[in-house]
Amino acid sequence: MPRKGPVTRRDVLPDPIHNSKLVTRLINRLMLDGKRGVAQNILYNAFDIIQERTGRNPMEVFEEALKNVMPVLEVKARRVGGANYQVPIEVKPERRTTLGLRWMVNYSRNRGEKTMEQRLANEIMDAANNTGAAVKKREDTHKMAEANKAFAHYRW
């Protein structure tokens, strides 16, 4: 926590091809070792694969996938009288997109396809169809929150 006042959020610039800040954030999540060009190539090639396979606009598919992956509730550990409770809390909109993008990238990295482009494209298409590991993660998060609903009054 800063001592000199609130931290201002840095805004990302929209990407040059799709003119979308979400795409830039996805590129930033994909990027390893500062290699933005490599991350951009991976994403744009994945979008080409999506366009080829579905015949739909890849941006629409991506936005639908992200909507299906973003969690509404999550649990946060809260210590009360020597016991730790998993307290369900609502996820703020900014964190929703951050978690959605993070899960999509992480689970696409763990997939079995040959190239990262194929993995990312398949994970996005799976998420758009409400299947895939990232959607399962969201479902598990919601289940945890539902199971711990009894501790909701410990919210702060």
UniProtKB/Swiss-Prot annotation:
- Ribonucleoprotein is among the record's keywords: yes
Give the GO terms filed under biological process for this record: translation
Q: Which UniProt keywords apply?
A: Ribonucleoprotein, Ribosomal protein, RNA-binding, rRNA-binding, tRNA-binding
The protein's matches in PROSITE patterns, at most eight in alphabetical order, are given as: RIBOSOMAL_S7
Any one GO MF term held by the record is:
tRNA binding
- Does the UniProt entry include the keyword Ribosomal protein? yes
Matches recorded under InterPro entries: Ribosomal_uS7 (IPR000235), Ribosomal_uS7_bac/org-type (IPR005717), Ribosomal_uS7_CS (IPR020606), Ribosomal_uS7_dom (IPR023798), Ribosomal_uS7_dom_sf (IPR036823)
Q: List the GO terms this entry assigns under cellular component, sorted alphabetically.
A: small ribosomal subunit
Q: What is its quaternary makeup?
A: Part of the 30S ribosomal subunit. Contacts proteins S9 and S11.
Describe its function. Answer: One of the primary rRNA binding proteins, it binds directly to 16S rRNA where it nucleates assembly of the head domain of the 30S subunit. Is located at the subunit interface close to the decoding center, probably blocks exit of the E-site tRNA.
NCBIfam families in the cross-refs = rpsG_bact
Spell out the HAMAP family in the cross-references. Ribosomal_uS7_B (MF_00480_B)
**Family membership noted in the UniProt record:** Belongs to the universal ribosomal protein uS7 family.
- Tell me what this protein is called: Small ribosomal subunit protein uS7
Organism of origin: Brevibacillus brevis (strain 47 / JCM 6285 / NBRC 100599)
Which gene name does the record give? rpsG
